[in-house]
Amino acid sequence: MSAHSLRILLLQACWALLHPRAPTAAALPLWTRGQPSSPSPLAYMLSLYRDPLPRADIIRSLQAQDVDVTGQNWTFTFDFSFLSQEEDLVWAELRLQLPGPMDIPTEGPLTIDIFHQAKGDPERDPADCLERIWMETFTVIPSQVTFASGSTVLEVTKPLSKWLKDPRALEKQVSSRAEKCWHQPYTPPVPVASTNVLMLYSNRPQEQRQLGGATLLWEAESSWRAQEGQLSVERGGWGRRQRRHHLPDRSQLCRRVKFQVDFNLIGWGSWIIYPKQYNAYRCEGECPNPVGEEFHPTNHAYIQSLLKRYQPHRVPSTCCAPVKTKPLSMLYVDNGRVLLEHHKDMIVEECGCL
């Protein structure tokens, strides 16, 4: 099996875990029954995966929690709990399973309401008040609705961009239960077609790009599956976070230590005027498995440390090495002239596992 085929199979497996199978036709809302099936979100994501030119750093597919299409008033509810760090939204679009242009009202603009609602806690009392947070209302004229790959597509970049730029704004929207909740007899929610999705294309902030580091580690730490792993540890399970607790003595972990350099000892003292000595620092110590964000790993180092945890005799540990350095200004003699020059990468500022 080729590496490309293996990656596709892994993506399919991840999708199956994250998105339950679509409901049967009898359970779908009336406006989706009996219609030709649209390409699944997985098929669309695979087409993006095969695209040789990535459109953004991160592409998310959010399945609708609830959809209500009544005439020209359309309401969509998604779980935006992933909004934990700032991102620059490049493009956002709703991809819906609608039969065709005849379902788009032509007498006026569509009113679109976007809500946030976290996925329900299975231990919650069904009679409890449900919380749904309004995020944005905007209008779309019929000419802005397009049809691509068997789906109805609505571009919604501008209304949602502020939420990714300031994820804390979502928390500020949480008001009193009286304002944001409604009490009603409990009825099971109507399943929503799994092909109704919100596609979000976003880039990491420029400062985060410049810092580099293991983007896979950030995703793993913020994912809902990582959060579930933490819960399993709290309940006595054996999860990823519990394994991380078995670390070497912190005093033996990768760190920066003093490293005094004397130019006279290496025979350079005759032409270097200043400094004659300086503290270059160096890195020493063990790297934990798996390695944490505080050790500034690359994606490759993070994956290597995970494999080392499960195959300790086959995979070598990552190495403690400089990840950030700074220059040293030196005054020295060159062909009878006195020069002042700044030489980069002379002093270790931070150590990490690579």
From Swiss-Prot:
GO terms for molecular function: cytokine activity; growth factor activity; receptor ligand activity; type I activin receptor binding. Residues 1-26 form the signal peptide. Keywords: Cleavage on pair of basic residues, Cytokine, Developmental protein, Disulfide bond, Glycoprotein, Growth factor, Secreted, Signal. It comes from Mus musculus. Glycans are attached at N73. Residues 27-244 form a propeptide. It is found in: Secreted. Essential for mesoderm formation and axial patterning during embryonic development. The keyword Glycosyltransferase does not apply. One of its GO terms (cellular component) is extracellular space. Disulfide bonds join C254-C320, C283-C351, C287-C353. InterPro entries: Cystine-knot_cytokine (IPR029034), TGF-b_C (IPR001839), TGF-beta-rel (IPR015615), TGFb_CS (IPR017948). It holds the Pfam family TGF_beta. One of its GO terms (biological process) is positive regulation of angiogenesis. The keyword Transmembrane helix does not apply. Belongs to the TGF-beta family. Homodimer; disulfide-linked. This is Nodal.
